[in-house]
Structure formats: structure tokens, C-alpha cells
């Protein structure tokens, strides 16, 4: 047939009236519709040689409308249904038959249906059914795209005796009649059962070959199932891949694309005996499928009819006419249920109600995408037919509803999709409402518009759908193996041309549909291919029929975005036919592989374009790569820069190391483990980079917090002190918190008791000391005694390293509050005590260095910190001042003993003697210690009357300080004399500024004159030469005059250098000459002598500059010493007229102007350099003012 089909209903007592009745009654070959006239023609077919005549009659399964909605194109809605346009299709070669006999056949079928208890056995011999071609055009016709349209029954019943199950169906009818009031809510569940029920039409041998039509009906509900119990289950057409909420594998196959096998009588009897049980189970499931969801199978296209039913299932509900028809047919179905008509399409109750119509879908509805799939059954049905007998009769083409009802007890249902079926299908196939109008016919093709065949919607969901299909097919396979009744299989010989088996072959034909349709979306085809790949070999053994010759070219359709080679179907196996029909003249009748060669391998990179689904969206284009090609296209995103990677690696390495080491420092670990972990951490900290990481991550405090109990263990305390010492080497560890500082001070308190040493194994202690010694050798250890490594020594060195001038006020405060200053003062006292006892030079040097380091700490914490100054003055009754005074006296004695001034006189070529090395070593330690002592005393007496008084009370301290100004510098190298002299003068100024007692003591003191005063007097005036003891004031005035004269002399020399600066010499390279009234420059010839002379002059200029700098330095030193001496004399004159008179006596002409001029220069210099605080400048200004009024 070439028209779209109307609907014929078989009624009680008469034939249905429809468009087909009009055609058959008028004996016309045209059918008038709104779209024109459709011409169809039936032709005779040929006998098929392999046909087996003895096929048993199979009970025909009628369909009864029992639900609330009837068929959309029932006799009540025939006039209202939209007519179908006829297409100019290729004519089908059919068996011609008389239309009168067709009408008679229809009546006969109706009577058979009403009888309901008879099974007519028809032996069909040499019945030839020609293949039908399925054009593409009428697949989706706009709003008329209704997949529920059903073909006239009489077209297929004309020459067939319908086989009807009779004996045991009345019980089922009664049960179903009771349950016919159930409303099936899950509309989409109809799509869960992709199997298309087919009724088998047996062709009568006496009549001509019938017109090639076939009945295929989609079960409206679970009650409408094939009457053969044990039929083959299949999961091939699991369209739920495309409908997200549909999951079912209850596809029941009772037939194959091969010819029907002979059904054995005993098998058929067994199926009839189990019918009641299946019917009872099926009634329970009948409420799960609504009536308005149908899929109809087309006729006699063995490759496509099964696919048509399933494809129609996809198209179901897409047209508006269908909705209208469903609403009308729902009334019909309800009336039929009330009338008690045939229930569930399985049994009839007398002649009550209307029999279920049989529908044959138009072939054009099946070839939508022009794809031919020929071996889907072979590749995908093996696992569902394992338990079926290999040689069953024609009854195997029928499927009882009871079979599915039995299997559905294990079926899991998913909630229905929230989208309407129309929306789902439109999304899947990309159809738009405005594109679904009727289209004009063409030969073998359709003109409707398809938007990308739905591929843009499938690319993202195929993976998920494949997984679901895999799981469901496995479940279906298990259920099939455990089915109680065997499935029926058709014989292989009588499939293609037998009209008796046309309805039965719909299932098998539809199974082949998806591979043969060119445009079937891959998401529909993909699960079939995967399932078929697993079962290909087994299916070939079971469904082994004669191969048919190809009817048309095959194109393996596949999704362009997922061209997986392993998922593409193999070359389809074409089964031989006695009569082949071509869709068009362009289709070759030769082997498929010869027509279309294998497609070229897909490109490695796939370009995907996502079409926007909503307005105001942009098209998204992306490049994708298949998983198997990933090795060729390695895409690395967010690549870090090289420096970032290195930094990340360093941070990760540091994190791993510190976590590992911290785990070994915990108190729960054994003592030896903790010691080794501390030494390992100290070894890491020897690298500056690791120390940097440790501080950057704030791990120093965490480490010392873990080692808080280390002072209780001698060896662990030693390791902890070594770790502190290593961390202090870069002098950047100012981030110590209070706890760490407290631990450091507690380590200072540890005493090296002999008793505690005995508690520890001496051998282990020596090992630890050796490791620490080797570790300390790798870092700066100038003041560390490697031979005497103790906890206190390491802790003290650490503390001294940390207390630089950069230490903040918080550090100074915490050190005092935690008791750190107490330990340092005690350490100073201890070192000073050793100075008087130690005769060994090495021990002497150690004591001197120890005292010097402690005093450096005290000096740094007392600068501009009155709190610490007062604390140290009061601590243990000025213990620090007493110890400092004693130490200063010892250093004065030692500096004379270890005179380093003589070493500077040694010849340059002579090697230093051994005693000179010792002298230099000890002498330097003494110098450093003296400077540290005076520095601490300066801070304690600065603007502090209490400190000045306490310091001045110390015996011999003022005399010692005066000697440091006048006598000590001669025992020091030239470069060290200025420093010690200025420090002594500063100490004397602080002592006499706020203390009248100290002023009185200094004025009444006698001392020797300055060591260099005699030298200066020898060069100058003899009146300045003084010998023996003199008053301190006289010695200080003499020093002032000498330094002031030296400064003037240096200044005059500097002025001479400036005056004698080379002037611009006359250019001797030429001369100006006047010739003929013009002045011209005439150059002279250069000689080598002039060039050498020029170089010599440049060298002389450099020497003069260096001399000028040296004179300026000497001048500055002399000016500062003279200024400090003048300030000291001015302080002595304050509030003491006697002292003013004394000083005036020693000044030239008794004039203080020379002193005030020097102080004014010094004040201006101090203001420029901001070297001292405002307090010193105020003091200088006060003294200047006082002297000017004297």
C-alpha cells in the first residue's frame, strides 16, 4: 500500500466502514483525502521456494478497548480524523486478490473473533508474500504524525483465518472485566515495552496473494500482550534511552526476520495451559500502561516493521490530531469497557463489545531516516532466546499478554517524565511544531524538516543512556533465562513472503529497523549495537535461516559526534527473498559493501556545535577528542610557570620534612628519638633556605613549644640549645615568642652538675656533643668554644645573637619580665670573678669574651629604655655596676700587660713572634671588653642622677675612666685610640653632669697628663710641657688645648690644599696667532714627554685628594675630642665658681671664648648629623650659655 492508513473497526454483526471500505467496495485504486488522491496497486507475488506449507493455525489476538481512552481513529472518529495525503510512492508488488473475497474474509474474521473458542487450523502452502518497500515520506507528517493510526483489518484478514486462543481466555476476560475500571496513570510507561504486538495472518492457499499489508499493534496497556506465554524477551528497542524516565526491558519477541519455524503441537498446548496463570498475573500489571500510548507495526517489511512500531512509539503523541483523537477514543474505550467487550486483547467474551482492531502502519512511517538495519536480531537477540525451542510453528509469532504479565512482576518502573511525550519527541528528533505540517509526496523520501535529527540533544546523554541500557539488558537476560514457559520461534522458511506470517514477523522485522534506517539517531541505535555485539554469535546459531539478497544499499548511520568504530554495526547480513521490491530505481540490487564503501576513519579532533535552545543564547563551538585518541592530543590546562612549580616543590618538600620531624619531637616519643629528631632538624636549619621556610610558615614557635620540657633532660636540652644556636646564625629570628624566650632562659639556668652528668651515659653524651660540634662547624661560630659545648653556653650565644639593636621594645620588656636580665647580670659577675683568678690565657680570653657578650646584650636592652636601666641599677644592689667597675679596672691592667701598640711598630717584613700572637689575641679581647663595659655604664648614667651617683660611688671608677681618656690610648693601636678616648670622656660627662659629688671628686683628683701632650709640646710652645702628676682639671684643659690646636692645624692644611688646588693651566697644544688682521689658533706638535707629564700630574692630584681626606678625618677626630673635653670642663664649671676660676687659670688669657667656639661647632655638627638625642643637644646649649656668661 502506498497510502497512509485509515482505521477499520470490526463490529459485532458487520464490517467497519472507513476509507478502506470505500476503496474495497468501490473497487477503486485511489483513495480521496484532503490532500488529494492516493493511488495504490496490488500485484501478484511469487512463490517462495523454501516455504513450508504445514503451519499450524495460531490464535489471533484481538484487541479490545477497555481503558478510559479508545483508539484515536475509531469508527466514531473516522469522520473527524484528518485525512491522509496519498504519496507518490513506489508501487508494491503484492499478491492480487478479489476485493469481494477480502470483504468476505473480513466478515469471516469477525465471526471468528466472536466465536472466541475456536482455533481454525489453516495449512498455507506456497503462499508468497512480497516484500514491501517503506518510503520515508509519510513518517512524520506534521500534525497528522500519529503513530496510533491503524490499518483496516480487512486488508490483512482477507485471505487469512485468524488464530484465536479460545479455551482458557474467558477466565481472563472475566477477571479483566472486573478490573477494566482501572485508570492507567503512567502514560509514559507505554513506551517501556518496545515490543510491538503482531497478529499473524494466515494466507489462504486458494486465493491469490493478498495485498501486502500487515497487522501490527502496539499494546495499549500491559494487558495487551501477545497471547503466547514464553515469548522471547528483548531489550533491543529500549527507547527509554531517549526518554529519561522510561526504563523497561520487557520486550517480548516471538518471531524473527527469518521465516517461521513449524510450531510443535506440544509446545503450543503447554502455552495454552499456562495461559490462565499468565492472565491472572497480567491483570495486576494492566493498570500500569495507559491506552493512549500505542506503537503499531507496519506490514511485511522484514527489516523494518519492528523498528516501525518502536519508531512509532517515539513519534507517539507528537501530533495535535492525535491528542484530539485520543480524547475521542477515550470515550470509545470507556464504553467498550462498560459493554464488556473483549478485554486486554487476549480473549473474547461471547460477542459482547467491540473487537480490537488491527492496524498496519504505512511503510513510509518506518523509513524515516532512510536506514536499513538487517542483522540486529542476529547480533542482539541471542541472550533472550536461550531457552526457546529452535523449531516452533507459526504460533510463535503471537505473543500473549500473559507472558508479559508474568515477566513484568520483576520489572522496575521509573517515575514518568515530567515532559509531555510531544516535547520529548520533539527534543529527540529536533522537530519543531511549525515544521510538522503535511508535506508533499515524493518517491521514497519525505520533505518534512528535521532539525539536526536530534543529534544536538543526544551528544550529552548517550553515555548515561548506554549505561542504563546495559544494566537493563542484563536484568532482562536473567529474567528470560528463568521464564517458566518456553518462547516460540518462527520457522526460518516462511517469513518473507507468507502473508500468514506477516503479522508475526513484525517483531523480528522491527528488530532490524534501527540498523537499516539511515537517520535513526545513534542514541536509539547505540544500545542495540552494544547488546548485539555480546550476543551476535549465539543468535546466529538460533536464528539461522537462509540469507536474503540485499534489497537496497545500507548506510551505517552513526552519531557524528561519537563515531566510535567499535560501536558501528558490522556489514548487515541480507537474507534471500523470492521476490524483492526496490524502494526506487536508484537503489541497487547488489551487495551493500559494493555500493557504499566503509566510511573514512573519523578525525581525531571533533568539532561540536551546540545550537541554542532558547533565544538570546549564543552558539557554542568546542573541539572534542575521542577517548582512544587522547594519547595524541594531550591537553594540559592551567600550566604553572616554572618558578611557581619550583616554589611549590620547595614548599611541599619543606612541609613533608617538617611534619616528619615534628612527629619525632613529641613528648610521647622515646628520648633518643627526640634527640635525633632535634639534631636532624638542626641539620636542616643549617641551610638558610630551610630557616627561611621555617620562619615564613611560623614553625619556630611550634618547634620550641613541643620541646618545652627539654630542660628536664640533659641530652635533650643540649640538642635544643644547639637548635636555637643554629637558628640564630642569620640574626633574623626576631619572631621568637614569649614561650621560646622563656625556654631559652631556662636553658641558661642549667648548671653542669657532676651528679646530673653521672645520671646520663657519658658515651651517649659524647656522641651528641660530637654531632653538635660538627654541626656548629658548618655555621658562623666566631665566639663559640667548640671544645666546651654546653647547654648554657649555646643558649647564651643564641641570646646574644638575638639581642641586636634591631630588637624591638617588646623583646627588651620580655627579657626583663622573664628574668633574662638576671641571668645575664649573673653571668657578667661570674666572668669578672674569673678575670682575677685565671692565669691561663685561654681561660682569660674565654672569660673576657663571655663578659663582653653579656655586656653587649645589656647595652642593647638599656639603650633609650629607662625601665631596664633602673632595673639593672637596682638589681642586687647595683651588682652590674660593681661588676662593671671591677671589670674595667682589670681591663686597664691587662691592656698594659698585653700592649698591642708595640706590635704596630714591628717591621712589615718580619714575621710575628708566638708571644705576639697571644698578645694580639688577649689584647683584642681586653679592648672589646673595655668598650662593652664603658658602653653599659654610659647607658646606665645617661640623664640618670641615680645611675651617675651609684656609678661614681664605685672605688676607683672615676680615676679609671680618666685614665681611659689620658693614658690607655697609648697601649692601643692607632685606629682604636679615638674610640676609647671618646667613650671615657662621655662616661665622665655623664658622671659629673647631675652629680655634685662626682664633680668634686674629679676636680680634686690628680693624674698624669696625656700621653701625647709632651709630643705636641715638643713641637710647639715649651710652656705646655708638663711633667709628673697634675690636677685632673689641668690635664683636661691641656688635652683640650692640644686637640683644639691640632684641629686648627689640620684645618689650615686643608685650606692650603684647597688654595693650592690646580688652576686651569694654559693650553699648550697650540697658541693664538694674529695674521692679516685675523686671530687664528695654531696647534703645536705633541711629544711623548708631555703626555707622561700629564699622567704624572693626575696621579699627584689623586694623592693630594687622599691626603686631604686623611687630614679631614684627623681634623674631625681632633675636633670631637676637643669638643667633648670642653663639654666636660663646662659641666665641671656649672654651679661651681671655684671650678670656673680653676679652669680659667689654665686657659690662655683666661678666656672661655675658645671653648664656646668649639662647642658651637660641635653643636652645629650634631644638629646636622642628628647623632644624639635632644637631651645631649640641650646639655651642650646649656653649657655654652653658661660659659658665655662667665
UniProtKB/Swiss-Prot annotation:
Q: Does the keyword Cell division apply?
A: yes
| Occurrences of domain WAPL (ranges) | 626-1169
Modified-residue entries (Phosphoserine), positions: 77, 221, 223, 226, 347, 380, 443, 459, 461, 904
Task: Give disulfide pairs as residue numbers.
Answer: none
Free-text tissue specificity from the UniProt record: Isoform 1 is highly expressed in uterine cervix tumor. Isoform 2 is widely expressed with a high level in skeletal muscle and heart.
Taking the first listed entry, what is the main subcellular location of this protein, grouped into a coarse class?
Answer: nucleus
- Post-translational changes noted in the entry: Deubiquitinated by USP37; leading to stabilization.
> What name goes with this protein?
Wings apart-like protein homolog
Query: What's the stated role of this polypeptide?
Result: Regulator of sister chromatid cohesion in mitosis which negatively regulates cohesin association with chromatin. Involved in both sister chromatid cohesion during interphase and sister-chromatid resolution during early stages of mitosis. Couples DNA replication to sister chromatid cohesion. Cohesion ensures that chromosome partitioning is accurate in both meiotic and mitotic cells and plays an important role in DNA repair.
Which GO terms label this protein's molecular function in UniProt?
Answer: ATP-dependent protein-DNA unloader activity
Q: Which residues carry this modification: N6-acetyllysine?
A: 168
Where in this protein does the record put region Disordered?
1-23, 46-82, 459-553
Compositional bias annotation for Polar residues: 494-509
What organism is this sequence from? Homo sapiens (Human)
Q: Spell out the family assignment given in the record's similarity comment.
A: Belongs to the WAPL family.
Stretches with biased composition (Acidic residues): 459-469
Locations listed in the record: Nucleus; Chromosome; Cytoplasm
In residue numbers, the region (Mediates interaction with the cohesin complex) covers 1-659
Q: Where is this motif: FGF motif 1?
A: 73-75
